[in-house]
Amino acid sequence: EMGKPILQGEAEVEKSAWVCDYYADNAPKFLSNKKVKTEASESYISFQPLGVIFAVMPWNFPFWQVFRFAAPAMIAGNVGVLKHSSNVQGCADAIEGLFLEVVFPNNVFRNLTISSSKVEEVIENSMVKAISLTGSTSAGKAVAKKAGSVLKKTVLELGGSDPYIVLKDSDLEKTTEACLKGRLLNTGQSCIAAKRFIIEESIKSDFENIIIEKIKDQVVGDPFDERTTIGPMVSIEARDQLKAQVKVTIDAGANLLYKSITPSNKNNAYHPVVVLTDVLPGMPAFDEELFGPVLSIISAKDKEHAIILANQSCFGLGAAIFTSDIEEGKRIAEFELEAGAGFVNDFVRSDPRLPFGGVKESGYGNELSSYGILEFVNIKTIYIR
């Protein structure tokens, strides 16, 4: 429905199964009572379900993002209702069908086929106890405002403009490989995609030359063809928005370093793979989230300057640092980068075993791991005199 290359779609389904297996194996441990020694004869912490959880989910990973929420929420004893993006209703119906096929009781997971204008009404419903939203920052703010007015718990996973810092001592062959995977997965339509490549100026030209050669190996084409690595964008409107952001960035002084070929029919949603260089703060490619196959290259005088540029963003979802000095990379990832995840010498991605969430305008709360399942439970103190 949204144009994902078929092999990437199959991988998404496998990952969705993985998160279900992960919580089936680990939820009993995560949710078991935790004894705490106090003056009482007995005291412990119990984890009880909240009730109905309302999920508002996007189109870009239409299976994974639902199961990422649903597996922990439902195994903790909650009920799920889903408002999926209108352009992936086939996925929404398929997910509901899966829950009807397995051993869950009837109606513990239902798909609401409603417009976005009805979301506030659902949030206000007294049966809804909490909300999980994955989407744009503007959508997150609107949901948080409404949920706040009725004091309901929210977990928000919003937009990102992930910086990838490349230091002069990095292995450029391995680094460019990771950077390209981080940028072009799902045709660049990912909140945790690499959006800003911040390169020490002494190696900037080498980085550009190597990554462009690797881009030439990408296959733009039919998403049903297993050879395809770059499919169409989700819509012509999304393509046109990205084109406009690229144009404004170039008009502001950035240079167009590379542009790939796309299918010749103009009435399609394909966007070329574009490499912009000499991108500066104040340009859309630096300040905004570019949701598509555009690489924005930014020059940094040195490591300290690169860190400043990386954090010069309203977003804080993921970040990566590439260096041969592993201890320094760990220090920067842990203590310097303002993000919910800091990766060293690899591209940012989610994993059921690790918490996933952002800071700043990338949202709040966590999904996945032991932390994610605790977002939608009542962490209850039990005290016996």
Report the location of each language-model feature:
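Structural detector of well-ordered beta-strand residues that form the stable sheet scaffold
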Residues: 74, 81, 110, 155, ...
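Residue-level signal for inorganic ion chemistry
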Residues: 20, 77, 109, 131, ...
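N-terminal Rossmann-like NAD(P)+-binding subdomain of aldehyde/semialdehyde dehydrogenases
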Residues: 1-41
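ALDH superfamily catalytic-core signature
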Residues: 130, 138-280, 344
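Rossmann-like NAD(P) dinucleotide-binding subdomain of oxidoreductase/dehydrogenase enzymes
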Residues: 32, 36-174, 300
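Conserved C-terminal structural/oligomerization subdomain of aldehyde/semialdehyde dehydrogenase
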Residues: 128, 165, 219, 263, ...
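Conserved residues at the C-terminal ends of beta-strands
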Residues: 26, 56, 115, 134, ...
